Amino acid sequence: MRREPVGVVGSIAPWNYPLQMAAWKILPAVAAGNTIVLKPAELTPLTSLLFAQAATDAGIPDGVINIVTGTGKEAGEHLVGHPDVAMTSFTGSTAVGKRVAEIATATVKRIHLELGGKAPFVVFDDADLDAAVNGAVAGALINTGQDCTAATRAYVQRPLYEAFVQKTAALMETVRLGDPFAAGTDLGPLISHVQRDRVAAFVDRARAYARVVTGGEAPEGELAKGAYYRPTLVADAAQDSEIVQSELFGPVLVVLPFDSDDEGIALANDTPYGLAASAWSRDVYRANRATREIKAGCVWVNDHIPIISEMPHGGYKASGFGKDMSSYSFEEYTQIKHVMFDNTGVARKDWHRTIFGDR
């Protein structure tokens, strides 16, 4: 058995972690012996260009790492559909991922998709409440919520529900918005005003069927001109509501109660996504059951969102397929060849009787 490079890899990276995502795609592809053409998001192209320049300065030969900037419609679709590209690796929304798969299928190329998420945060009634509250706020607000593994749906067993809502809202209200380069800032702006307005629209529509406990607005004053949005907690939404089912990509956490363990796990699985999840319990057997039954590519216990480079990252269901990081990512960028040598020197093999009989 031999693993060989696939050839030319065409990759498309998102804007939310421009350096990290570029590295996740470039490094395993090149380490496996491929060349790569990377298209960064049009909102964040400079990081990838600087990365490629640093690679050249370090001695990587010209033509191994290539950066192509442009829009998804023009540069991205052309890259995915090009017949000389042997594999496509895409990180981004599920909607765009479906389009990538459609284009790639026309040339029957390999596809690696890391798509959207709607990570559940399941708190059982024996959990450490303070730890869960801190984990929920940090997990929901990481990168201003612009993270496909961010905690977005907190399911809290009913005995802890109201206390969790109150404590989480209180902690969110202590988070300081401001310039990301300022020492006292906890939370910066979203990527753009378009994204801020999209998040705000989700929350505004939710007011008709749910309770906005805290946040739900852009700040006033000196931050009003930026793409800022206050940390937001939404409670009492229905499971089938838009804000529970759709990926927002902003600093918004929705909290819902559940009664039995069966119900909590069922609710956690009840979206199209399956990228990441967390379960909170002092009972290792209870938590381990959750890790088995929650359909997600990563399930943390008593923590949310630690990403470890030695462990694989990738999803189930509409969150895509294939793995980033770890040795599994290396395998994504190779193809398996079966090689067989016959050194017996025998001209007519035993199996040749299927043609020649006993002659």
Regions flagged by a language model, labelled:
Residues 12, 68-71, 91, 139, ...:
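Conserved residues at the C-terminal ends of beta-strands
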Residues 30, 37, 66, 112, ...:
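Structural detector of well-ordered beta-strand residues that form the stable sheet scaffold
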